Amino acid sequence: MAQQQAGARGSKLEIVAARGGSGGSSSAGDAEAPPLDVLRQDSLYRDATRPAHGHHGQESWMRTLRLGFQCVGILHADLGTSPLYVYQNTFKYGIKHEDDIIGVLSLIIYSFVLFTMVKIVFIALHANDDGDGGTFALYSLISRYAKVCLIPNQQAEDELVTRYNDHGKPPATLRRAQWMKSQLEKKPAKIAVFFLTIFATALAISDCVLNPSVSVLSAVNGLKLRAPHLTTDEVVWITVGILVVFFAVQRFGTDKIGYTFAPVVVVWLLLISGIGIYDLVKYDVGVLRAFNPKYIIDYFRRNKKDGWVQLGEVLLTFTGTEALFADLGYFSIKSIQLSSTFVLLPSVLCTYIGQAAYLRKHMDQQHIQNAFFNSIPRPLFWPMFVLAIMTSVIGCQAMVSCAFATMSHLQTLNCFPRIKILHTSRRYSGQLYSPEVNFFLCLLSCVITLSFRTTGFIVKAHEICVVLVMVITTILMTIVMLLVWKVNIWWIVLFFVVFMSTETVYLSAVLYKFTKGPYMPLAMSAVLMVIMFVWHYVHVKRYKFELEHTVSPNKVRELLERRDLKRVPGVGLFYTELVQGIPPIFPHLIEKIPTIHSVIVFISMKHLPIPHVDVSERFLFRQVEPKECMVFRCVARYGYRDTLEMADDFVTTLVEYLQYYIRDLNLYNTVEPLKMSCPSIRIDSFSWDRRPSGHGIYAEEMLTPIQSFSELTMHPVGMSSRLAQFQTTKMSLEEMLKIEEDQKLIQREVDNGVVYILGESEVVAKPHSNLLKKVVVNYIFNFLRKNSRKGEKMLSIPRRKLLKVGITYEI
């Protein structure tokens, strides 16, 4: 029962209704709490005890070290397997000069330090959205400080949700933040920021297709050194077999792989660093000259255009860097910085230096191919081969998990058709799995592996995804610095100039080879972007149509007071995307079926641009006039990482907070202005002896729905005098009984049954629309809608309790 659950949460609440400057004291045993301003009489906004701010709070060093160890297993595997294919792709046409090896090594060292360590680990991680990273989190952070969302469903109450403005509002004197906000809220800027976000998202998903192919194929290629009779076809089919098994086990919740096999990645990084030191000492210590950036200049002087083109292969050094930022949610910034600085950086640099030393003595093409496995001492080949396969799979896991999470986030933005999202762990809310996404990732990865057959072509496609995501991240990071961070403008200029200039050079080198592979991820990204744009465009148009055609209050009153309208027992939950007003489908329902339930609640499921919304701040209510008709509007707010409850659980929570609202609404309507304060500790005894001073009116320790106001008359000792005192206040016993009666009515109708009413709106283009709009709306969108999951499945609504109402909108 909802009332019983309400009682479990806390049976008493102190309500203070005051005029002017009057006030009152709390009981001696109570810790006084500051009053909370009520937003308006007909809106419930309950400020509960707020959870602690910050990502992980104050961490102990032991916790940081433990998180750092797990971080190695989940985030560093992809970066740790890049040495498998960097040199063999960079020098695939041979080494022209022995100092070219030192030049490329110098590029690798400074590129890795600049982009992985400086940009991501020490700068970008601080631009997280309450512990979530990636371009999606940057967009969410921007949308909290500027109205860049294309759907007009923002509400003033949203900004009061915990963690909505964790970074603090920029001071009014900070002119650049105000200027940036005004520029971003212009329509062209909104579209541009949205375009960049979904473009980066589409590229990241395309990268999730390419990454498993490159990593696993590079690892399996090492077999040719010990089994030279293996053909390319056999290597490809072995790779495909591993990929199929890898994607097949995703449904079991393989985020656990990262935790279980963190020791595997640690052993891998330790071994490759040890082998790198061994090769350095054995072959050529002189490659340490690569720490002198002069060799980069000499390299470009010697190779000119060819050296510039080879930059595309050098950026493979930091593939997987985006995972450090995107998968921040499980870890703290300190743990990632610690593990990256003291484990990842030295291990990766040692193996690149060791391979360079080996290649200085073995410059022929035979040794350049599979340079990594050739540089390994013979007794360690098989252990390293097995570790390479395992580490590659673990590295792919982080990317695939990112794809599942990204698709879930896209749905909260209404940028992608509804697909099935499963939670594979009850303990970790971020462990997601989507059968549809997993199938297409597996299919495309296998097709790409079978089509290109070698890493050379796939790597070129991989490069374009990496560098474009880097460029977009730099742009969004700069916007965050200007809008949110209180940083000196010259530091922002330095950040933008340094990273945008260097990344543009890398991008130009990759685009030069456009016809040799990079078109593939752009083609995949283009298809994804068309789907995202069409779905979001029609969704925005449909929302605006409903907003323009909301039912007026007079029309609602007229509908509810119709003589032929029948009220049947039970509660009707009417789902709508509209957060303002009554949707136009409501009068359509009454015209077709002039019968509604005794209690009607219009529910709008809304996702805020923050990861999580506490359940105590989830619901906003407003009662629709006339009040005796018991019709309410409710906005249920979720973060983009929050899980939607099962239908029955949702109803239980909804009814609990609806009863709170009924109680508070009646109390708030007694006097104006109103203040509400919540005691910081629970009180189990009545304290009605103190009288309010001046014009203050008190109803202290009001009972929650679980307890009856009529129970007050059952206390024999001294209760009659206290009731007499209470009846002199403005909140009379009759009014309190009215509150109880309304609450009991709600619970009684819930017991009579709950029916879920869903509007099934079909959208078509207006007859006079142009051909492109007709194709987009009538064909592409409706095809996507018919092949996506139905709303009742997304909300876990039982079919026996479902009522659908069909309507057609012309947009």
Swiss-Prot record:
KW Magnesium (keyword) present: no
Intervals, Extracellular compartment: 88-100, 212-228, 278-310, 359-379, 460-463, 510-519
UniProt main location, coarse: membrane
GO biological process, one term: potassium ion transport
Membrane topology per record: Multi-pass membrane protein
Domain of life per record: Eukaryota
Alphabetized GO MF terms: potassium ion transmembrane transporter activity
Annotated localization: Membrane
Transmembrane feature ranges: 67-87, 101-121, 191-211, 229-249, 257-277, 311-331, 338-358, 380-400, 439-459, 464-484, 489-509, 520-540
Positions of disulphide bridges: none
Keyword annotations: Ion transport, Membrane, Potassium, Potassium transport, Transmembrane, Transmembrane helix, Transport
Ranges per topology, Cytoplasmic: 1-66, 122-190, 250-256, 332-337, 401-438, 485-488, 541-811
GO cellular component labels: membrane
Known role: High-affinity potassium transporter.
Family affiliation: Belongs to the HAK/KUP transporter (TC 2.A.72.3) family.
Protein name: Probable potassium transporter 16
UniProt organism field: Oryza sativa subsp. japonica
Organism phylogeny: Eukaryota, Viridiplantae, Streptophyta, Embryophyta, Tracheophyta
